[in-house]
Amino acid sequence: MRRAALLIFCLLSAGAQAPEGGDTVRLTREPGLSAPARGVLSKLPPGVRAGVLVVDLRTRAVLETQAPDDAFIPASTIKLITASSVLDERGGSSGAWTAELTVPAAQVGRAQVSHLTLRGSGDPTLAVTGAYSLRALAQQAYAHGVRQVGQVRLDQTPLSGAWAQTPLGLPMTALRLAEWRVRPPATAAEAQARLGAALVQELRRAGISVASAQIGRAAPFRPYVPPARTDDQGRPLPPDPWIPLAQRPEQGVASVRSASPARVLAAMLRPSDNLRAEELLATLAHRPGGNGTLAGALARERAWLRRVGVDLRGVRLADGSGLSRENRLTARALVTVLRAQYDLPHPLPGKTGLPGALYRTRGNAFIEALPQAGTGENVPEHDGRGGTLARRLLGAGLDVRAKTGTLPGVSALAGYVTGRSGHPLAFAILMNGPEDAPILTLRALQDELVQELAARY
């Protein structure tokens, strides 16, 4: 009887010591590699190790594993985390970024204003011309009756200089222009000058005169706090609801809305654009909770990963592009992200349906932003539908949508393939080795493994 009581006590104690913070406890034995998969990976060059995880998204079965919880340098597959976090933060593909021009509340309706302030969402898609542009803002301000402006100001909420210390080596600013992709500003001061000059030019083009060529910085918004009031007996009274005009928030005279975030995510993921990836990560710093810092943006990514059930043991995030060799991901972390984007899809505009239907009909915004293998395009910028996978798996007849990753000694592939059963499979293949490891050989083995998976399952 005592032994039975002791056993019960030990079991209860063990339960009380379960891992904290949402750590995953796996009680089922997962399979290793099948013979065909082992045959492929047996051809890895000396010194190269691989982590593999493959899951059937319809049956939830784990199909193949090798070191799924080991941490690897992920290279550009980290962009899957960046894209997922931004898509979630924007509310899916129907969300948007916005920009507006504001004037002091006391000057609303006047033709002459002391200053005009540009405020934005921190995204990289605002352009000089087009629907979501400085030109459209200037034309709206003119239509609103603005004719003379004393000074143009920019709401350049400061972002941490830590981005300049990442391998990309460029500062991130709260207001950016799409045209900077070709020649991005080297400093925050250069960004301020170039953006301000472009806005002044568009205002003048629209018929609005600007007195000062000097670009100002918008004062940070501070909520009005009414003074305390008391009655003639010294007892506190409710605050006066009337806010003096000078203390009221500036009012908008023009606003524009971006296209679907799905478009810029595709423009980042398909060609594996490092600058766009860091710009998109910076939007998470710009939003409340990001604190204007790289660390704040990465913390928001980790928070999203926790929400979708990613086991964060071994995971380390250092940037948004994957250029940093300080990043670490596991195959399990990547497959959990892929599974979450399949199970909880963000439909493209005009698309509806359950996860399987959206996958089949090309309606899942995240999955459709990925490179598609074997499209055959041969474009130098990798900006076609196939992106960095356009020339891989040519003629294989497979439906593969996945993200590549490459650094010296690092090659990775993570995404989706439709198996012969018709089931969608989520897979992650991470390979790390010496910096002189033959990357083309690693890619060829990844492609061979994906073909084996599709044929077997």
Where are these regions (language model features)?
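Secretory targeting and sorting signals
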Residues: 1-20
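Beta-lactamase-like hydrolase cores
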Residues: 19-73, 97, 137-146, 294
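Active-site SXXK
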Residues: 60, 74-93, 198-199, 268, ...
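Small-residue-rich helix-loop
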Residues: 63-65, 286-457
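Short, well-structured active-site flanking segments
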Residues: 88-106, 212-217, 366
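Active-site-adjacent helix/loop patches that line small-molecule binding or acyl-intermediate pockets
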Residues: 99-103, 111-205, 257-300
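Short, surface-exposed beta-strand/loop micro-motifs that present aromatic residues
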Residues: 102-107, 252, 411-420
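A small/polar active-site loop signature that marks catalytic segments
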Residues: 182-364
